[in-house]
Amino acid sequence: MSLKYTCPSCGTPLGYEGLCWKCKCEQERQAALAWMPEQIVEKQRNLIQNIQRLADMEDPEFADFWQLLGYHDAITPEIQRVALAAEVFWPCEIYYHAPADVRDGLIHALLSAEYSSAASNLMSCLAMQGDDKAMETLLELGRNPRPWRKGLYVDPSSYAQIGGWTFDKEGQRIRLGFDTCYPMVKGTTGEKSPVRIGIGRAREDTCPHCGGRMVDILVLDGRDERLKFLGLDGILTATCCPSCVGFLKGPAFNRFTLDGGVEVFPSELFDGAEKTDCYVSPEEYKALTENPFVLGKTPVPLFYGAAC
């Protein structure tokens, strides 16, 4: 059955009149990116005055928070202090890199917590704050669990991962991410980019399970100046079967060489079968080869992808 409407921006068939969700998100993103400084200040002020509405997921405060954080990196210590005073501990991202006095308030609340639900939220907040004292607190709680630990599924070190880091049993910090972020943006036909995601670059080899074409799903050239922060002096290529990758018993492992070469390791289907059907159509393979996204020219805030 054909749908009655189409998106006026991209032509996607729809069951309703108006923009599709992708174009709607893009429209909202561009509007938020165009905020003037005085608009940002006004939205910060409104968030401070109505901080409880953020916890209740009420708009405009909820949408404003994510756009202030994701597009402008504009969650101020004042907002964080007001959130702490009001005991607003969700979303935890509000405490990202909060100042020491806010961190101490979070630690006090965590050490005073009686229930696992409250402790879970507070450890997430402390993970977002993320300094050495925050780590020391989570490490101590891992070594000497409180009664509420019985109501949680994972240790404090797993909560630290929410903030982009963790630690081992000896208390050594382990970074899980980078402090630099570039977006993938729509490029033009044939435009070169040091990063390609889902490009479906043509390969001669086929999948041993379904017989479908293998694809280079990610190609990343670490020699590009924008990607120097990765410390990769060469080209990373990741290859998989787009049909079977979701049906494997474990991860789809590769070994790459810095000249762009890749070796695909043997894999096993989740049900132990030797063969299966290929569920990727020729049209879908073609769409992979026409992916238009390229690496953006300038860095963006770390939470850029969370704002939409």
Identify the role of each PLM range.
Residues 3-308:
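Preference for intrinsically disordered or flexible, low-complexity segments
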